[in-house]
């Protein structure tokens, strides 16, 4: 029977009954033996109360004899640093029942390991298990290492598709576990729904919103579970029971040992879904307004790309999450060579002469021959590297996740010096100017070191405390005696390069993590978090706005950088747009949409724009001369 679901919600007391209006199917689960599991989300270890609240829930679960397993639906920690994931692992090791866990945005965006430590500790960042006739598939939505909306990585989309195709029986009832809701906050949610709606999906269970809530994701029931935290009230989780083809959700307070009345009772049914998620698909109509912009070629690497490409000698060089460094021909987009490192790559390659320099989460800096892709040398550190390398005066400068910043001889791969006073990890690409190497870290500080010997010159800190306000992602730029940065405190700062003193700070525009420099160094450009691109003078001791343009791109937190070339400013967004503005007044000259997902900083050569995306694709646009 074909079923188009409609929700008719009736609240009786605090019990929500959801009637979906089709007959039960005989293959749904076990009619006599109930399945019961504990459902936790958003434990946020690293906060003052997170670890204790999780311990309380684990102790409580261990005292019950009817719990078959436990699920933790992401944001287990505040960050992937300072041993927070180890704490989660140690607490969950006390469970007497199996558990299944996925990462959330906190473990993947703020990650010293690029998400690799989570996989190492818990075996994977996804799961596919079956209990008593029901299948549970868990997959994360990032965003992986870059600030943006949620996104299901291309490699994970493929994994989900493969898991479902292998499933037997084909009509087995399936529950998906995600961290984000599968709605507009996940930029490629339509791709996910296109796949799963061919199967008997009973519900998508998730966290992120820190409350209990029933939703509807293109006709698929969506169930948000509360945060485990006791912030603002009792800590708690949900006990979920499936019995007689009905799923019941009950909130449990472990310290008080109290079960509330069921807040959701969901009949399980034989679902056959219609295509009702067209509104989530990207609107590409803007491309018809600017027919002078065309796609010349697109290359699909099949794994997430989180950094800009480098274009040199008619080659397009980039790394991706598979750990490969890939070289394409600029003219046709054909693969010329690839080199496999030992871990995912989240950084932009640097090039000097005939050599490519790439950092990898396998803890190494690689030097690769530009012509043939052969390794020249490898420099190994003691932790993952998620920071971009920069080259100056025959040295490769890069930060690490081991509390160090290094300079390595670009020809020999030998250490020149290291700086060992960083308390967390480095993610940015350093600026080298006026004999200094300048970079931020996830410890709230901007550092200036002597480029020759690594000695500290100065440290700078913004006005807000807390790691999340660190100037750690922005690539600093230099002009007219000042270093310019932006940070998650939404303030642009100009800092004297000689002594690290603040020249000015401005919150006129709500900036975040991107800033670019004009070709003549007279202006810095930044995308704001809402619609506006601003151009600020680099001259003088006070901020002066040259122009601001309402580009109408909506909410924007993609850290990709505005780039000026030949009188135009180019930038990309988290929703797959590339813009070109007139550098003199900020007027829009054209825009083009490549897809729905986050794009990295565009590289512009003449009338060619090469841009990589989180979807694993590299696209070359060309414009009419």
Annotate each PLM feature.
Residues 27-87:
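N-terminal active-site segment of His-dependent metallophosphoesterases
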Residues 37-56, 77-79, 108-121, 143-154:
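Acidic/histidine-rich helix-loop elements
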Residues 50-53, 74-92, 108-120, 185-191, ...:
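Metal-dependent catalytic neighborhoods of phosphoester/phosphodiester hydrolases
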Residues 62-69, 148-221:
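His/acidic metal-ligating clusters that form di-metal
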Residues 220-283:
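Binuclear metal-dependent phosphoesterase catalytic core
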Residues 290-310, 336-352, 377-392, 401, ...:
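Extracytoplasmic beta-rich repeat domains
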Residues 329-333, 369-373, 409-413, 450-453, ...:
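Short loop/turn segments that connect beta-strands within beta-propeller blades
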């Amino acid at each position: 029977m074909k079923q188009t679901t409609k929700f008719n919600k009736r609240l009786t007391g605090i019990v929500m009954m959801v009637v979906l209006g089709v007959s039960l199917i005989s293959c749904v689960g076990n009619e006599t033996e109930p399945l019961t599991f504990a459902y936790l989300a958003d434990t946020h270890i690293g906060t003052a109360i997170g670890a204790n609240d999780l311990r309380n829930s684990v102790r409580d679960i261990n005292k019950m004899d009817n719990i078959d397993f436990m699920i933790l639906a992401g944001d287990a920690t505040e960050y992937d640093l300072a041993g927070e994931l180890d704490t989660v692992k140690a607490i969950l090791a006390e469970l007497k029942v199996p558990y299944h866990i996925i990462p959330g945005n906190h473990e993947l965006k703020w990650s010293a390991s690029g998400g690799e430590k989570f996989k190492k500790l818990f075996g994977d960042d996804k799961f596919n298990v079956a209990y008593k006739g029901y299948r549970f598939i868990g997959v994360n939505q990032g965003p992986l290492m870059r600030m943006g909306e949620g996104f299901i990585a291309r490699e994970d989309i493929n994994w989900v598709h493969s898991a479902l195709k292998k499933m037997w029986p084909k009509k087995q009832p399936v529950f998906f576990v995600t961290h984000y809701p599968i709605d507009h906050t996940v930029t490629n949610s339509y791709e996910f729904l296109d796949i799963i709606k061919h199967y008997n999906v009973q519900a998508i269970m998730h966290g992120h919103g820190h409350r209990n809530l029933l939703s509807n994701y293109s006709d698929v029931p969506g169930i948000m579970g509360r945060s485990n935290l006791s912030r603002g009230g009792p800590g708690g989780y949900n006990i979920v029971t499936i019995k007689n083809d009905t799923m019941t959700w009950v909130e449990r307070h472990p310290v008080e040992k109290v079960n509330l009345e069921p807040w959701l009772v969901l009949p399980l049914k034989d679902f056959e879904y219609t295509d009702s998620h067209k509104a989530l698909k990207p609107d590409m109509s803007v491309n018809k307004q600017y027919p002078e912009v065309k796609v010349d070629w697109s290359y699909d690497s099949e794994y997430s790309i989180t950094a800009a490409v480098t274009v040199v000698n008619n080659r397009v060089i980039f790394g991706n999450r598979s750990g490969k460094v890939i070289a394409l021909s600029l003219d046709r987009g054909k693969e010329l060579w690839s080199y496999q490192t030992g871990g995912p790559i989240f950084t932009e390659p640097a090039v000097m002469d005939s050599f490519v320099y790439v950092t990898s989460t396998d803890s190494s800096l690689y030097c690769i021959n530009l012509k043939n892709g052969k390794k020249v040398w490898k420099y190994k550190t003691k932790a993952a590297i998620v920071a971009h390398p920069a080259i100056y005066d025959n040295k490769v400068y890069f930060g690490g996740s081991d509390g160090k910043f290094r300079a390595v001889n670009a020809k020999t791969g030998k250490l020149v010096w290291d700086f060992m006073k960083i308390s967390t990890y480095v993610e940015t690409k350093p600026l080298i100017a006026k004999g200094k190497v300048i970079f931020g870290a996830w410890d709230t500080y901007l550092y200036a070191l002597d480029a020759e010997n690594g000695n500290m010159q100065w440290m700078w800190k913004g006005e807000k405390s807390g790691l999340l306000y660190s100037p750690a992602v922005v690539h600093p730029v230099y002009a007219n005696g000042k270093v310019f940065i932006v940070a998650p405190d939404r303030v642009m700062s100009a800092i004297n390069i000689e002594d690290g003193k603040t020249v000015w700070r401005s919150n006129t525009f709500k900036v975040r993590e991107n800033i670019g420099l004009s070709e003549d160094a007279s202006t810095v450009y930044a995308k704001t978090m809402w619609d506006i691109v601003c151009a600020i003078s680099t001259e003088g001791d006070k901020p002066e706005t040259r122009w601001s343009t309402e580009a109408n791109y909506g909410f924007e937190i993609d850290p990709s950088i505005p780039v000026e070339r030949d009188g135009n400013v180019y930038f990309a967004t988290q929703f797959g747009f590339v813009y070109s503005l007139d550098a003199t007044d900020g007027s829009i000259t054209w825009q083009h949409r490549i897809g729905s997902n986050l794009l990295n900083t565009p590289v512009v050569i003449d009338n060619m724009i090469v841009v990589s995306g989180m979807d694993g694709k590299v696209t070359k646009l060309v414009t009419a001369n």
